[in-house]
Amino acid sequence: MTNIKRIQRICDANGISGFEDAVLEVIRKDGAHLGSFEEDSLRNLYLSRTQNQEGKPTVLLDAHTDEVGFMVKCIREDGMLEFIPIGGWVTTNIPAHMVRVQRRDGSTIPGIVGSKPPHYQSEAERKSVPDISSLFIDIGASSKQQAIEMGAEVASPVIPEATCTYNPETKLLFGKAFDCRLGCSTILDVMEDLQEETLDVNLVAGFASQEEVGCRGAQLTARKVNPDVAICFEGSPADDTFLPPYQQQTIVGKGPMLRFIDSKMITNPRFQRFALDLAEKHQIPVQQGVRNGGATNAAALHLSGQGIPTIVIGIPVRYAHTHWGISSTEDVESSIRLARAILSNLSEEIIAGF
């Protein structure tokens, strides 16, 4: 079942792509009772279920640990920090938000993303989208030397400032990094729920790094685990606030979205149908999506080795790749139920049919 406190711990941790250490620390603590951990040099974290037995097919449960953010490019003489985006951002979503500039020791400096005020903008500037190079981070330093003394430096990771909160009346979560820390938390919940159950498959969780910059971690996890099938958990961008109802396929509160296609993968139709049939049988709400954009770690997983049958369980996230997202714990719970049903019914014979 959904663990709200766990979601908050994992989502609040600092961890832009390449700097996921704090996230891994939380996952290690929360999952210590579920099996044994391994880690590689790219900061991928592997959790092998205690009950795994030789000779059974292996299922990789994938979710990425990194979040979108920024990195300090240089420090101006006036103490302002210029930066580059890490992951996909829409420039208009960046200014006037608070950020955390991470020091070497892991502590952070609060800052605000600044831009030229409208009072000083030309008419053309007011009508155009600002270039990210025109933005800067203000940490309150009045000189380059002061910024350095405060702990800022070239290549400092910069994390969106947001603390995960939960509204029990609406069952909605508000916070950062739902893409895909919700998946990380869901995997732990699933493995916890299945602790006492005998399965016909082995489970290995792959908490992958650097998804937001090109699914890099998943390329390693696929090779190391060499699974027979994979389930990729993702925070999928919700489309329910801007598309007409007949086009909406990722609605917050209506269950996880299982995509048939995106820009990098055509989902294995047999594994997909297996999952959808189980959802119908167990009355688990799900949504079906046909995406002509976007991609997930499944892009790397399904092409590994001789090919890995892979599906994506996408938890809807409004305003993904911004400081604040909105997701429903009902969708998280439905994702947990669906994953449990899939894993409880998988066998060597069924996998061979994919």
Feature-to-residue mapping (PLM):
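N-terminal hydrophobic/helix-forming segments and targeting peptides
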Residues: 1-354
